[in-house]
């Protein structure tokens, strides 16, 4: 039974109402500093911890709760007579409920004007110590670190005569240990990111020790293959617009491959300003297009490779309306992603309950890092978020691209970034015409892209081509020109750039160098 609570919070969301409810249930309130003042100003009967321990706060508040009368009351096991006798001998009442959240260290170091001294002062000591004590003794003590749990605790207390059950206490304790681990991880990341100058402004993006924190969203039926187990975890600092923010409206449970492919589709479609559709198969775009609306964009994207689109993942950057839904519903699709679905569109898919509909709000946030596991280690890099500006483009051929060719080239370049290397993409009129992905030689990717267009009945005459990396020889260029391309965009940087440019002039096509490579593995 909860008779006495200690409350000390930095995030004061909902704390007055929670404390009032506790007081109404007859719980004695202990508190510190600003929290105690807030509760007292609200007319609640509260005892300052300094008055409770008989020892004043000291060292500018660094020492407030580090006292045997606090930790003894938290750590004592109620089932051990010797523990209870020790409390009685020293006049220490039990503390049955601890409500604590910590100094805002992460928010502090996120500020541009934060100094090392600011960061150090926002490293909480007493808070984590109390939290860990209470979480360790969770059989007897209820500990709350998240304001979202106030209502849960109150409801259980009201239903059980001020008692909280073991299952809830255990869940809350595990939440505490996760929270303090993340807190210490953030401190370690920060301190080990400082350079020799020990200045906040000169932090390295890659700390000497990297701590990552993720919460499990769900266990998955299996991994990439049925014999592999898997789970999906969400970054605690999920950026706006990221896949992990999805809301599933209908359909079967997402699989490992569904999630991986959905991320590829969503990241690609978000980059377009015009209404766009991206169709993904095995993490590669097999159709990308922009159009007047979602239905138009889908119709164009589907034309690229109808065979590969079967059972694919489809993403839109505009609402899916009834027209788009009816067009998509004619095909077998695993997952459909959009910022929103009209009521009429939802009705269309109501008859296809296996189709997974994911709603994700658009946003321009990105993960801080791109991560890849290797045997015994982790590769960490910044995101491939470089967008080439028009002023950075360099026409290196005698013939300049026309305005239409320039539009097609920029579209193709945007798509090529999301195709597995080696990547060759034919485009025209705001749609992909042929995609060659994941080949060990660039010339083979060029041939495959050409064959794909031919199989789909699409002409490549007058098309634009993007290559994610330079042409090492002229052979790849010769293939795309023979297929009908009249302009090419590529990074450049090959030892044989001069030969490739000369070949482009020989074919009387336009070529643009971006100076930026987009390998994707």
Curated annotation (Swiss-Prot):
CDD domains: IMPCH. One of its GO terms (molecular function) is IMP cyclohydrolase activity. One of its GO terms (biological process) is 'de novo' IMP biosynthetic process. One of its GO terms (cellular component) is cytosol. Pathway: Purine metabolism; IMP biosynthesis via de novo pathway; 5-formamido-1-(5-phospho-D-ribosyl)imidazole-4-carboxamide from 5-amino-1-(5-phospho-D-ribosyl)imidazole-4-carboxamide (10-formyl THF route): step 1/1; Purine metabolism; IMP biosynthesis via de novo pathway; IMP from 5-formamido-1-(5-phospho-D-ribosyl)imidazole-4-carboxamide: step 1/1. Residues 1-145 form the MGS-like domain. NCBIfam families: PRK00881.1, purH. Gene3D superfamilies: 3.40.140.20, Methylglyoxal synthase-like domain. The IMP cyclohydrolase activity resides in the N-terminal region. PROSITE patterns: MGS. It catalyses: (6R)-10-formyltetrahydrofolate + 5-amino-1-(5-phospho-beta-D-ribosyl)imidazole-4-carboxamide = 5-formamido-1-(5-phospho-D-ribosyl)imidazole-4-carboxamide + (6S)-5,6,7,8-tetrahydrofolate; IMP + H2O = 5-formamido-1-(5-phospho-D-ribosyl)imidazole-4-carboxamide. Pfam families: AICARFT_IMPCHas, MGS. Signal peptide: none annotated. This is Bifunctional purine biosynthesis protein PurH. InterPro entries: AICAR_Tfase_dup_dom_sf, Cytidine_deaminase-like, MGS-like_dom, MGS-like_dom_sf, PurH-like. Belongs to the PurH family. Coiled coil: none annotated. It comes from Burkholderia lata (strain ATCC 17760 / DSM 23089 / LMG 22485 / NCIMB 9086 / R18194 / 383). Keywords: Hydrolase, Multifunctional enzyme, Purine biosynthesis, Transferase. Its EC number is 2.1.2.3, 3.5.4.10.
């Amino acid at each position: 039974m909860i008779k006495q609570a200690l409350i000390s919070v930095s995030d004061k969301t909902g704390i007055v109402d929670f404390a009032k409810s506790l007081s109404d249930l007859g719980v004695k309130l202990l508190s510190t500093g600003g929290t105690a003042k807030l509760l007292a100003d609200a007319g609640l009967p509260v005892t300052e911890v300094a008055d409770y321990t008989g020892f004043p706060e000291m060292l500018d508040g660094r020492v407030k709760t580090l006292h045997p009368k606090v930790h003894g009351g938290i750590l004592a096991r109620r089932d051990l007579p010797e523990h209870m006798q020790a409390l009685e001998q020293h006049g220490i009442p039990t503390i049955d409920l601890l409500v604590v959240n910590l100094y805002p260290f992460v928010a502090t170091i996120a500020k541009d004007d934060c100094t090392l001294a600011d960061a150090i002062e926002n490293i909480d000591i007493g808070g984590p110590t109390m939290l860990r004590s209470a979480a360790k003794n969770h059989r007897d003590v209820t500990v709350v670190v998240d304001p979202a749990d106030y209502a849960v605790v109150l409801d259980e207390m009201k239903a059980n005569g001020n008692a909280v059950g073991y299952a809830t206490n255990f869940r809350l304790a595990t939440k505490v240990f996760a929270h303090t681990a993340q807190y210490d991880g953030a401190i370690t990341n920060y301190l080990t990111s400082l350079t020799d100058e020990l200045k906040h402004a000169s932090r390295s993006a890659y700390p000497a020790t990297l701590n990552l924190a993720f919460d499990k969203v769900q266990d998955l039926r299996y991994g990439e293959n049925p014999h592999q187990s898997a789970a999906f975890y969400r970054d605690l600092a999920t950026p706006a617009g990221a896949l992990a923010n999805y809301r599933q409206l209908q359909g079967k449970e997402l699989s490992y491959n569904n999630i991986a492919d959905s991320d590829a589709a969503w990241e690609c479609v978000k980059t377009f300003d015009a209404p766009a559709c991206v169709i993904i198969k095995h993490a590669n775009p097999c159709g990308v297009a922009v159009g007047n609306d979602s239905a138009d964009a889908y119709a164009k994207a589907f034309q690229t490779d109808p065979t590969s689109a079967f059972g694919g993942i489809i993403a839109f950057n505009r609402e899916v309306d009834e027209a788009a839904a009816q067009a998509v519903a004619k095909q077998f699709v695993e997952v459909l992603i959009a910022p929103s679905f009209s009521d009429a569109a939802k009705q269309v898919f109501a008859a296809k309950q296996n189709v997974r509909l994911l709603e994700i709000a658009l946003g321009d946030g990105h993960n801080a890092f791109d991560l890849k596991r290797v045997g015994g280690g982790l590769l960490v890099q910044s995101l491939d978020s470089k967008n080439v500006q028009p002023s950075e483009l360099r026409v290196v051929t005698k013939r300049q691209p026309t305005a239409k060719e320039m539009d097609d080239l920029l579209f193709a370049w945007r798509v090529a970034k999301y195709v597995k290397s080696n990547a060759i993409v034919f485009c025209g009129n705001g749609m992909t015409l042929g995609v060659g992905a994941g080949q060990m030689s660039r010339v083979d990717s060029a041939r495959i892209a050409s064959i794909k267009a031919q199989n789909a009945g699409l002409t490549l005459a007058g098309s634009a081509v993007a290559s994610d990396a330079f042409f090492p020889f002229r052979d790849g260029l010769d293939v795309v020109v023979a297929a009908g391309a009249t302009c090419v965009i590529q990074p450049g940087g090959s030892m044989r750039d001069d030969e490739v440019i000369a070949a482009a002039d020989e074919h009387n096509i336009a070529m643009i160098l971006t100076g930026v490579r987009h390998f994707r593995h």
